[in-house]
């Protein structure tokens, strides 16, 4: 079997790595940026840390900040207009998955205008040309959008999240600078960190996993287990922030190339229909879906238990699986993640609708254990 592994052309890591930006702009022969970010990152001065680097280097730019927490088709169309008017020749994405995913859609459609309706990008679109060059600087340690070939856009008209998979969308350059994450609020640090853990665990047990992807996912789980609580409780701790920044990227390197599973399949409609933050949805659902999947992946669950420091000598595979699930659940509780859908304003009568959407989601077929719409409904009920 032939396997494919796609990564960025160049990536930089470490506090202050944003200072590498001008050199990469020059190396790529680029001239002007459209900065894609959100209003909060501008308000709290995070985006300014990157804009200062551009200013010092004399690199011109314009700013597009009309990006929602769960970016929509409308956001993308506004971004396309902004890019066309700006005269920019590259996209500079500053933010979490929302900013980077929006940049991917803008970049792909600009060079593949036949997809200008945006909705036709859903699934594996047959694009012919690479995106406009994207340089991505994540400000959260969670989505790993800077290294993946996936992006998610909400089709607000049909209340669904479109998962788009396209090797042509991957950012040319990723700059993972933990200093951009120091002011991330506790709740967002927790949610994005558990999003990264979900990527690592689902990427480890998905049907498409293999030895190379496993290697990255196991390391990501170990690093998240070691650093997440400290990053939540000590936001300016450089070791914890940098550890999480690298861990989420490592998780993304692998899952982007092998797929995910039912946790993401179930999280997507929560975001599309009810605007629940993606990391919160994943974090709440992860231990519940892990329990369901355990019989299909017991050996991998032993590995997860070891990576989470929950394995004890002499445990059976079933005991180790239980320990792995409990370790994930307890971590989620300790960092303050809601444990019930009712806490998020979801009503019990909404669950069948969610189950139908989750069963049809592009991530669900990668689940290691075969799953039906009825199974998904029962899992939502457990989460309720």
Regions found by a protein language model. Give the residues of each.
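An N-terminal, well-structured beta->alpha segment
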Residues: 1-64
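Glycine/threonine-rich beta-strand-loop-alpha-helix active-site module
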Residues: 74-176
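Carboxylate- and glycine-rich phosphate/diphosphate-binding segment that chelates Mg2+/Mn2+
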Residues: 150-258, 374
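Short, amphipathic C-terminal "tail helix"
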Residues: 347-384
């Amino acid at each position: 079997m032939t396997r494919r592994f796609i990564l960025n052309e160049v990536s930089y890591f470490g506090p202050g790595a944003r200072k590498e930006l001008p050199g990469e702009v020059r190396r790529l022969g680029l001239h002007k940026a459209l900065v894609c970010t959100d209003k909060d990152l501008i308000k709290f001065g995070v985006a300014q840390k990157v804009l200062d680097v551009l200013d010092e280097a004399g690199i011109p730019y314009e700013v597009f900040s009309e990006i929602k927490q769960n970016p929509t088709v409308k956001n993308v169309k506004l971004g396309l207009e902004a890019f066309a008017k700006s005269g920019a020749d590259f996209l500079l994405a500053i933010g979490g998955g929302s900013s980077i995913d929006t940049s991917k859609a803008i970049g792909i459609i600009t060079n593949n205008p036949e997809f200008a309706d945006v909705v036709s990008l859903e699934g594996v679109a047959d694009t012919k040309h690479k995106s406009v060059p994207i340089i991505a600087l994540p400000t959260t340690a969670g989505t790993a959008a800077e290294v993946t070939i996936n992006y998610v856009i909400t089709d607000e008209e049909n209340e669904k999240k479109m998962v788009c998979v396209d090797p042509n969308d991957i950012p040319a350059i990723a700059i993972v600078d933990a200093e951009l994450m120091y002011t991330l609020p506790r709740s967002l640090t927790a949610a994005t960190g558990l999003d990264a853990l979900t990527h690592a665990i689902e990427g480890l047990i998905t049907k498409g996993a293999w030895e190379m992807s496993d290697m990255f996912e196991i390391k990501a789980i170990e690093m998240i287990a070691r650093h997440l609580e400290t990053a939540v409780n000590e936001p300016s701790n450089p070791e914890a922030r940098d550890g999480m920044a690298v861990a989420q990227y490592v998780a993304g390197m692998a899952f982007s190339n092998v797929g995910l599973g039912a946790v993401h399949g179930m999280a997507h409609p929560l975001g599309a229909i009810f605007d629940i933050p993606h990391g919160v949805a994943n974090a709440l659902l992860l231990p519940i879906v892990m329990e369901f999947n355990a019989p299909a992946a017991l050996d991998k669950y032993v590995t997860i238990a070891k990576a989470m420091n929950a394995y004890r000598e002499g445990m059976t595979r079933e005991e180790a699986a239980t320990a792995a699930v409990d370790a994930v659940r307890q971590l989620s509780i300790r960092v303050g993640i809601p444990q019930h859908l009712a806490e998020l304003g979801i009503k019990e009568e909404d669950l069948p609708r969610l189950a139908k959407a989750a069963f049809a989601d592009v991530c669900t077929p990668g689940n290691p254990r075969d799953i039906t719409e009825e199974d998904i409904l029962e899992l939502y009920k457990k989460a309720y």
